[in-house]
Amino acid sequence: ARLKELEARTGRRVYTVLQLRVHPSLLALKERLGQEKGAKDVVLTYVTGRGKWYGKSWKVDEAKSGGLATNIGIHFFDLLAWLFGRALHVEVHARTPTVNAGYLELEGARVRWFLSIDPSFVPEPLRRQGKRTYRSIAVDGEEVEFSEGFTDLHTEVYRKTLAGEGFGLDEAAEAIRVAALLRTLPLSQPSPENRHPFLG
């Protein structure tokens, strides 16, 4: 609310960096979804390995970083809102220093999600290649793997912003709302159909 007030008072805009919205694979997915009808079944997996330094940094202090759901997951929740709309129902199935997981019912999708900084969750074939990151979204069983292609995303967001096509506060609001809920909701036992496969 304060940032909106500052915008009104100064006549200037606050822009956010929502870099997954400019990822080529995800732009193609967004276009495809725009041509399809009906709610989707989605499995979103986001593993981004972090070293021991992470556990000793300010990032594990929820008061400073917002916790794992915000620090690592905010772009992941923005992606879901951008593709499928607002969250209507939210469940948290796991919340540890290294793993968050749960279920979201969005306007256009039912989403089982998993977020971790533990590289042991990277699928074995990718780990053998030395990979410590695995980002995947499966929509009705069709996977879009988007671990690669991150090099120039920030630059592209800055380019769009300077061209007057940036992402404003309203576009970031839903992801912030969901991440805040995930920090405070009590854990719930997942039903078999709402459980992310990585939870076993």
Predicted segments, located by residue:
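Predominantly a Rossmann-like dinucleotide-binding segment in NAD(P)-dependent oxidoreductases
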Residues: 12, 20-86
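Beta-strand scaffold of nucleotide-dependent catalytic cores
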Residues: 41-43, 90, 111-116
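Beta-strand-loop-alpha-helix segment that lines the small-molecule cofactor/substrate pocket
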Residues: 1-18
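C-terminal helix-rich "cap/oligomerization" subdomain common to oxidoreductases
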Residues: 9, 159-200
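Conserved C-terminal active-site "lid" loop/helix of NAD(P)H-dependent oxidoreductases
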Residues: 153-159
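C-terminal substrate-binding/catalytic lobe of Rossmann-fold NAD(P)-dependent oxidoreductases
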Residues: 98-153
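Conserved S-adenosyl-L-methionine
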Residues: 45, 87-96
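Alpha-helical elements of Rossmann-like donor-binding domains used by nucleotide-donor carbohydrate transfer enzymes
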Residues: 2, 24, 28-31, 79, ...
